[in-house]
C-alpha cells in the first residue's frame, strides 16, 4: 500500500438489525453458559418486522427460556415500540434448535492428534491484528467508527437527543500521510429518527444535522484530525423506517465491523452465538491477543497473525506472523516466539483466555476488539514483557 492514501471503515449501532441478531445469539450463549459452561452452542438468529427466529445447534444441560432471553435483549437495545420496527412485548419468537451433530462432536471431544486436548470444531483460517494507530492498538478508522455508534446510543438512551431511534450506521474515511493517520477526510453518520426531524421527504432539518455533528461526532473524534472534514448526515434525507422493519437481520453478517474494519484479511467465520470450541471465534480472539502483545512489546508497529485448523485436529495447520516490514526482528523469528509462548490448540486458547464464561453478549456490538472491558481477556498485554525479553530487546 502507498504511504499516502485514504482508508475507510464502518460500524453499525446495537439497533442495526444484524446486530440485534448477533446480540440475541450471544445473550442466549451467555444464558446457557451461566448454567452449563461445557455446552456446545451454535445459536443463529433472524429478525424481521415483528418476528424473531432462533435456530441452530445446542447441546446442553441448561434450562433456558430462549424466548424471554430474546425479548429481554430487544428491550435492552431500545425496541419498545412497534413504530421502531419491532417491539419486545409483542413480537413473535420462534424456536427451532437441534443438538450438535454426533459426527462433529466426536472430532471436537477427542482430537485425532492429541489425546490431552479437544479438536477444532471446524476447518478454517482466522486472523488477528494490532497496530500502533490508537492507544488500544487498533486501526483508527474502525476504532472511531465504533465510538461514534456508542455515542449515538448513549445520547439516545439518556434522553439528550430524544429524537434518535436505535438503528444507525457510521463510516470514517481517514487520510494517511507517510503511512500514519493524518486527518479525517469524511464522516458519514446515518441514524434512525422520529418523523418530525425531516424538513421534507428528502431533507433533514438543519437542527438535526447540527445536533449530530456537535453532540455525537465532534466530542468523539480527535480535534487535530478534523481538518476540512466533510460530514454526511443522513444523506438520503430521511431514516424513519429502520431496524428489523427496514431490513431483515441475521447473525454473522457484520464480520468486518466485528473485527478490524477491513484493515486486515478475514477468514470468513462469524463470532456471535458460538461457544469457544468453535475456532472461528476463539482462535480469532487468540490471534488478536498474540498480535496485540507483539505490538505492545515494541516488536512491530503493526502485526497480522494467521492461524488455520482442520476439524477434529487440535494443533493449528499454521501460525504465520506478518508485520509488513515494521518488525524489529524478522517475521520468522516472531513466528518462533509465538510457537514458544502461546498454546493455540483449542483447549489451550480456552484456558489461556478463560473463555468458558458468560461474557459474550457485550462483544456483540461496537466491536470484539480494541475495547477496555474487564471481561475481554484477549485485550490484555500481559505477555508483552515476556516477548520483549525473549526477543532480546
UniProtKB/Swiss-Prot annotation:
<dbReference type="InterPro" id="IPR022628">
    <property type="entry name" value="S-AdoMet_synt_N"/>
</dbReference>
<dbReference type="InterPro" id="IPR022630">
    <property type="entry name" value="S-AdoMet_synt_C"/>
</dbReference>
<comment type="pathway">
    <text>Amino-acid biosynthesis; S-adenosyl-L-methionine biosynthesis; S-adenosyl-L-methionine from L-methionine: step 1/1.</text>
</comment>
<feature type="binding site">
    <location>
        <position position="18"/>
    </location>
    <ligand>
        <name>Mg(2+)</name>
    </ligand>
</feature>
<dbReference type="InterPro" id="IPR022636">
    <property type="entry name" value="S-AdoMet_synthetase_sfam"/>
</dbReference>
<dbReference type="GO" id="GO:0000287">
    <property type="term" value="F:magnesium ion binding"/>
</dbReference>
<feature type="region of interest" description="Flexible loop">
    <location>
        <begin position="100"/>
        <end position="110"/>
    </location>
</feature>
<dbReference type="Pfam" id="PF02772">
    <property type="entry name" value="S-AdoMet_synt_M"/>
</dbReference>
<comment type="similarity">
    <text>Belongs to the AdoMet synthase family.</text>
</comment>
<feature type="binding site" description="in other chain">
    <location>
        <position position="100"/>
    </location>
    <ligand>
        <name>L-methionine</name>
    </ligand>
</feature>
<feature type="binding site" description="in other chain">
    <location>
        <begin position="238"/>
        <end position="239"/>
    </location>
    <ligand>
        <name>ATP</name>
    </ligand>
</feature>
<keyword id="KW-0630">Potassium</keyword>
<keyword id="KW-0554">One-carbon metabolism</keyword>
<dbReference type="InterPro" id="IPR022629">
    <property type="entry name" value="S-AdoMet_synt_central"/>
</dbReference>
<feature type="binding site" description="in other chain">
    <location>
        <position position="278"/>
    </location>
    <ligand>
        <name>L-methionine</name>
    </ligand>
</feature>
<feature type="binding site">
    <location>
        <position position="247"/>
    </location>
    <ligand>
        <name>ATP</name>
    </ligand>
</feature>
<dbReference type="GO" id="GO:0006730">
    <property type="term" value="P:one-carbon metabolic process"/>
</dbReference>
<comment type="function">
    <text>Catalyzes the formation of S-adenosylmethionine (AdoMet) from methionine and ATP. The overall synthetic reaction is composed of two sequential steps, AdoMet formation and the subsequent tripolyphosphate hydrolysis which occurs prior to release of AdoMet from the enzyme.</text>
</comment>
<comment type="subunit">
    <text>Homotetramer; dimer of dimers.</text>
</comment>
<feature type="binding site">
    <location>
        <position position="247"/>
    </location>
    <ligand>
        <name>L-methionine</name>
    </ligand>
</feature>
<protein>
    <recommendedName>
        <fullName>S-adenosylmethionine synthase</fullName>
        <ecNumber>2.5.1.6</ecNumber>
    </recommendedName>
</protein>
<dbReference type="Pfam" id="PF02773">
    <property type="entry name" value="S-AdoMet_synt_C"/>
</dbReference>
<keyword id="KW-0547">Nucleotide-binding</keyword>
<keyword id="KW-0479">Metal-binding</keyword>
<dbReference type="Pfam" id="PF00438">
    <property type="entry name" value="S-AdoMet_synt_N"/>
</dbReference>
<feature type="binding site" description="in other chain">
    <location>
        <position position="57"/>
    </location>
    <ligand>
        <name>L-methionine</name>
    </ligand>
</feature>
<dbReference type="GO" id="GO:0005737">
    <property type="term" value="C:cytoplasm"/>
</dbReference>
<feature type="binding site">
    <location>
        <position position="274"/>
    </location>
    <ligand>
        <name>ATP</name>
    </ligand>
</feature>
<dbReference type="GO" id="GO:0005524">
    <property type="term" value="F:ATP binding"/>
</dbReference>
<feature type="binding site">
    <location>
        <position position="44"/>
    </location>
    <ligand>
        <name>K(+)</name>
    </ligand>
</feature>
<keyword id="KW-0067">ATP-binding</keyword>
<feature type="binding site">
    <location>
        <position position="270"/>
    </location>
    <ligand>
        <name>ATP</name>
    </ligand>
</feature>
<dbReference type="InterPro" id="IPR022631">
    <property type="entry name" value="ADOMET_SYNTHASE_CS"/>
</dbReference>
<dbReference type="InterPro" id="IPR002133">
    <property type="entry name" value="S-AdoMet_synthetase"/>
</dbReference>
<keyword id="KW-0963">Cytoplasm</keyword>
<keyword id="KW-0460">Magnesium</keyword>
<feature type="binding site" description="in other chain">
    <location>
        <begin position="253"/>
        <end position="254"/>
    </location>
    <ligand>
        <name>ATP</name>
    </ligand>
</feature>
<feature type="binding site" description="in other chain">
    <location>
        <position position="16"/>
    </location>
    <ligand>
        <name>ATP</name>
    </ligand>
</feature>
<dbReference type="GO" id="GO:0006556">
    <property type="term" value="P:S-adenosylmethionine biosynthetic process"/>
</dbReference>
<keyword id="KW-0808">Transferase</keyword>
<feature type="binding site" description="in other chain">
    <location>
        <begin position="167"/>
        <end position="169"/>
    </location>
    <ligand>
        <name>ATP</name>
    </ligand>
</feature>
<dbReference type="GO" id="GO:0004478">
    <property type="term" value="F:methionine adenosyltransferase activity"/>
</dbReference>
Amino acid at each position: 500500500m502507498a504511504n499516502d492514501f485514504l482508508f475507510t471503515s464502518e460500524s453499525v449501532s446495537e439497533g442495526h438489525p444484524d446486530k440485534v441478531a448477533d446480540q440475541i445469539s450471544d445473550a442466549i450463549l451467555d444464558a446457557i453458559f451461566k448454567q452449563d459452561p461445557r455446552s456446545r452452542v451454535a445459536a443463529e438468529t433472524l429478525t424481521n418486522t415483528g418476528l424473531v427466529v432462533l435456530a441452530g445447534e445446542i447441546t446442553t444441560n441448561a434450562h433456558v427460556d430462549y424466548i424471554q432471553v430474546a425479548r429481554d435483549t430487544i428491550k435492552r437495545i431500545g425496541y419498545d415500540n412497534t413504530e421502531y420496527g419491532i417491539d419486545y412485548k409483542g413480537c413473535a419468537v420462534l424456536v427451532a434448535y437441534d443438538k450438535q451433530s454426533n459426527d462433529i462432536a466426536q472430532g471436537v471431544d477427542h482430537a485425532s492428534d492429541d489425546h490431552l486436548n479437544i479438536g477444532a470444531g471446524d476447518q478454517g483460517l482466522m486472523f488477528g491484528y494490532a497496530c500502533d494507530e490508537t492507544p488500544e492498538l487498533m486501526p483508527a478508522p474502525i476504532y472511531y467508527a465504533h465510538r461514534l455508534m456508542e455515542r449515538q446510543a448513549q445520547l439516545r438512551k439518556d434522553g439528550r437527543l430524544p429524537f434518535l431511534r436505535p438503528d444507525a450506521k457510521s463510516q470514517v474515511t481517514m487520510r494517511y500521510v507517510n503511512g500514519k493517520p493524518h486527518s479525517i477526510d469524511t464522516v458519514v453518520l446515518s441514524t434512525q429518527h422520529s418523523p418530525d426531524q425531516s424538513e421534507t421527504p428528502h431533507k433533514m432539518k438543519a437542527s438535526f444535522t447540527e445536533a449530530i455533528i456537535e453532540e455525537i461526532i465532534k466530542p468523539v473524534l480527535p480535534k487535530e484530525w478534523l481538518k476540512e472534514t466533510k460530514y454526511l448526515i443522513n444523506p438520503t434525507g430521511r431514516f424513519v423506517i429502520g431496524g428489523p422493519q427496514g431490513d431483515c437481520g441475521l447473525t454473522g453478517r457484520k464480520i468486518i465491523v466485528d473485527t478490524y474494519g477491513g484493515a486486515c484479511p478475514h477468514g470468513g467465520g462469524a463470532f456471535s452465538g458460538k461457544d469457544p470450541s468453535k475456532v472461528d471465534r476463539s482462535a480469532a480472539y487468540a490471534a488478536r491477543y498474540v498480535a496485540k502483545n507483539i505490538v505492545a512489546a515494541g516488536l512491530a508497529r503493526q502485526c497480522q497473525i494467521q492461524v488455520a485448523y482442520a476439524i477434529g485436529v487440535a494443533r493449528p495447520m499454521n501460525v504465520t506472523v506478518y508485520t509488513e516490514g515494521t518488525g524489529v526482528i524478522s517475521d520468522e523469528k516472531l513466528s518462533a516466539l509465538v510457537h514458544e509462548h502461546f498454546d493455540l490448540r483449542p483447549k489451550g486458547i480456552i484456558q489461556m483466555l478463560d473463555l468458558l464464561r458468560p461474557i459474550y453478549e457485550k462483544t456483540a456490538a461496537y466491536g470484539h476488539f480494541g475495547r477496555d472491558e474487564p471481561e475481554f481477556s484477549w485485550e490484555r498485554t500481559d505477555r508483552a514483557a515476556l516477548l520483549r525479553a525473549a526477543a532480546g530487546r
